[in-house]
């Protein structure tokens, strides 16, 4: 059974999405969630100081990649921290790095493990800043974890905000907790390309054994590139892949963050995507295909490469 099917079932019904290493000097206590009287006011100021990182639990989790690996569920997430202060972190000896790592045995109580990387990989920084006027490459976003044989592959992206100047890289380890070794670049884009190299999601086709990486956000739509299973890198160096999904007007009709999973009972691949502006009508939609690389169609059989809207809508602001 696919790793995600323990978490996600009946994919056209209401869906629950649970969605060198740089470790903390000692293990953190397991976080126990507490209810808030008003979730809109829940800003977790009580544990927002940099020295409180062992108490973060699920606080400061953005764009998580979660998978059952051995006895634990492991979760990796974007470098976005409420009240982040790297100067304060250095002064107080906080080992602040990049890509937060957590683990849990029940998906409720989470232990903060630390950060995967001590620094943003230099190759990614050079690519982004040299193509964005010295801007960008300040955080690592949207990591994705997947096992292969006796290794664990951690995909990640570095970008310049609001531009197509981006880089998706790969690190490997023999443990889901690291340490991580940089393996290289999968795809990189700039203002001259149609697509944007962020938000990777990787899957192996159950029938062909081929590996595919879906990626992209905003500009130009979502794309899919074939990977070499043995290396985890692009099968053909420099290949940016083929178009999978798009919308008509990216200034108002946003499309981002593909997530591809396989449903073994239905023998189909489901592509979850985020639609519309983050701060207003943000929502999640899903399409499906008989092949991991597509083509994908919506509930009504309409191709998601079409520029009109696709359905169904699974989640929306304050709705499920």
Predicted regions mapped to residue ranges:
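Bacterial Sec-dependent N-terminal signal peptides
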Residues: 1-34
